[in-house]
């Protein structure tokens, strides 16, 4: 969950319910893998929110979901990654003083070309790194991201078994 400025950049459908605006937001992110390890980011938002997360962010106007996922991975982690395949969608909601935000996140299995990462401090990311599946799974703060990680990692294993991982002509 990013407590950034989603409601300023998102396509929103404002429905007044009891004085609170309901805002629908769409983000995209990636489960980025290099040599079997998964990229995670550690976010500490003004000491109110902290934990390990997958890279994701808000879709900008005119942007395709794949473009958003690639851009957000680069912005939040400094990592260059390519899309392998669509994994699925997760949903959650959170509240701000002005709104209840209903968030859809579209996830992609992605491949990096190195272990390099540099967390985006301006967005309160304090650390980043690549971790083995079982480590990453237990480090992740949110259950919905754990489910996406599990789905993406199973796809990765299937591609590895078929000798298709890393062979870009198949994607």
Predicted regions located by residue number:
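Functional cleft and adjacent loop/helix regions within the main domain
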Residues: 55, 61, 170
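N-terminal strand-loop-strand
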Residues: 18-54
């Amino acid at each position: 969950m990013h407590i950034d400025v989603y409601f300023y950049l998102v396509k929103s459908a404002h429905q007044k319910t009891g004085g609170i605006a309901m805002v629908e937001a769409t983000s995209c992110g990636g489960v980025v893998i290099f040599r079997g390890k998964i990229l995670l980011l550690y976010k500490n938002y003004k000491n109110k929110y902290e934990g390990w997360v997958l890279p994701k962010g808000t879709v900008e106007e005119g942007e395709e979901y794949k473009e958003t996922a690639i851009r957000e991975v680069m912005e939040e982690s400094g990592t260059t990654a390519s899309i392998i395949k669509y994994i699925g969608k997760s949903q959650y909601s959170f509240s701000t003083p002005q709104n209840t935000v209903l968030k859809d996140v579209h996830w992609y299995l992605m491949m990096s070309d190195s272990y390099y990462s540099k967390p985006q401090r301006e967005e309160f990311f304090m650390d980043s790194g690549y971790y083995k599946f079982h480590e990453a799974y237990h480090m992740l703060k949110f259950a919905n991201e754990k489910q996406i990680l599990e789905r993406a990692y199973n796809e990765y294993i299937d591609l590895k078994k078929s000798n298709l991982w890393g062979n870009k002509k198949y994607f």
